[in-house]
Amino acid sequence: AHLNEHMLFKGTEKRGAASINNLLENVGGELNAYTTKEETVVHATVLKEDLRRAVELLLELLFTSTYPDKELLKEREVVYEEIISYKDSPADSIYEDFECRLFEGHPLQYPILGTRKTLSRIESSTLKEYLHKWFIPDNMAISVVADMEESQVVKIVERALRKYCPGQHCDIIRESTPQPLVAGTAGGRTAAGEAAPLDWTPVPPFRIEINKKHHQAHCIIGTRAYSYTQERERLALALLANILGGPAMNARLNTVLREKNALVYTVEACFNPYSDTGLFTIYFGCDKPLVERSLRLVRKELERVIEAPLSSRALANAKKQLLGQLAIASDNSEAQCLSMGKSMMIFGYIEPMETTRSKIESLTSSELQRVAQEILAWDNLSILIYK
């Protein structure tokens, strides 16, 4: 999927790589893409008068890419360098290493970038087969944020679809009644659209220390968590992650490890839901002799949220902080566009901000405590340390 994302920009039935790059850049636009564990996203930012140009180019890339052999040879080397660069950054590579170990036996164990061995086996024919299997309209969502009349946008998109996907119709999604998700059906679909069954036995909690030639130690503490289908628990854990290690300087772990004890520069808590499982992690980097003390303080903070419910004031403040962060993020048109597309792919609808706000506001301290007890119990957590 990741190599395919790179190769989409290397040639279509009517354009070479340079022409693809120039088409939007010549009018001040941007064209980019990224791959996650469960999706590929190709996106463009342009002036509204250039929307047609952008939409047609995106569909041209997705449906008529040719994967020239000479470009594939070069792009393999580019991805090799990307892998090396990633491995040279322990703060990044430890996340990948942790997921590989935590999700052993599950598709999530595989690194997005691949390996030199797996990349060497991928030929142009492999990528073409992948394109025709997965890049079909039933697997896609087109998201547009623009200061334009909806009818104008629909006309542009449907015209491009007729050009590159004859017979395909554009279903317009505004606000709709959410349908209950079934575990395993958000993302992770087969080419025919049905849920891909998984036969997977989770690995038991582990603690692994790996000697690395780095000046600093890096540590991840984490566990499997909730999927997209578990809405109340997912929202509660997202709020807990923000309380413990969100971007604010007053996050609890940052206050204890950095501000009070000067043990770390960076500490963060992250929750990533997937279609059939999820991942909760806490990461910090510190001087090697300080690892155990830092771990003890992290454990103490986790035990605080497990043993005692948040006060009504602390809960209200935490909700206000998260809602403020979400509102500010939604002011970014590109972020809003990407979020809408992801919501369509996962849930089949776009949730208004007011609905999200109401759901977060309705969370109770007892719900957060129950989620903390289920996910954050120390004996359930796995630990990976680069020393």
What function would you assign to each model-found segment?
Residues 3-4, 166-167, 177:
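Intrinsically disordered, low-complexity regions enriched for glutamine and histidine
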Residues 54, 236, 249-253, 294:
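Catalytic-loop motifs flanking and including active-site residues across diverse enzymes
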Residues 1-24, 98, 221, 232-244, ...:
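Active/ligand-binding-proximal structured segments within catalytic/core domains
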Residues 17-172, 209, 216-219, 225-228, ...:
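Charge-rich, well-structured scaffold segments of protease-associated domains
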Residues 172-178, 182-183, 192-250, 343:
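His/Glu-based metal-binding/catalytic segments typifying zinc-dependent metallopeptidases
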